[in-house]
Design a protein with these regions (language model features):
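Hot-dog-fold acyl-thioester-processing enzymes
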Residues: 2-109, 170-172
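HotDog/MaoC-like acyl-thioester-processing domains
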Residues: 1-34, 114-172
Length: 172
């Protein structure tokens, strides 16, 4: 027994038997989601390092993202901007961590709108609403569309998008 009074002997020092224990952090099944259901992700601050790595990996070596002196003299926003595609990628990462682990099957389409600039040091989160769910012709999967709002620490909506995804159904 542990000091909290919880039985621990069953698994202490053992590797077998864990397959019967529920996995936490699993994604949602399409048939568990209802139109109108809302959720939000954890928040994440976008750093200078995030921008540098993203620009390097993607080849987006635009001076607006790489030259701080140019940004100071030419930018109308007065700070290092975050590429809109990086904002989107971070949002998808936040959603993957909280809603799609082992259940997401395919990303099919979306309409992405960048509404306001995001700059280094901004903290964003996704606020999502389920707007469509339906089964497909093949059993065990369905389509889910959400309307996602990307909100910064000032409660400003900086982007919106409405992905359509193929998602696993609850196992029978």
């Amino acid at each position: 027994m542990s000091k909290e009074g919880i039985k621990t002997e069953k698994f202490v020092g053992k590797t077998e038997g864990w397959d019967d224990i529920a996995v936490h952090g699993m994604g949602w099944y399409w048939d568990d989601l209802k139109v109108g259901q809302c959720f939000r992700t954890l928040a994440r601050t976008i750093t200078e390092a995030d921008i540098t790595m993203f620009v390097g990996v993607t080849g987006m070596v635009e001076e607006m993202f790489t030259n701080l002196e140019y940004i100071k003299s030419e930018s109308k926003i007065g700070a290092r901007p975050v590429p809109g595609s990086l904002v989107y990628c971070i949002c998808e990462g936040l959603l993957m961590q909280s809603t799609m682990q082992r259940t997401g099957m395919a990303f099919l389409e979306c309409d992405l709108r960048i509404l306001k600039p995001t700059v280094a040091g901004d903290t964003i989160q996704v606020q999502a609403e389920v707007v469509e769910t339906r089964g497909t012709s093949k059993p065990g999967r369905g389509l889910v569309r959400t309307f996602n709002r990307v909100v910064n620490q000032r409660d400003e909506v900086v982007a919106t998008y409405n992905p359509l995804r193929m998602v696993k159904g609850r196992p029978q």
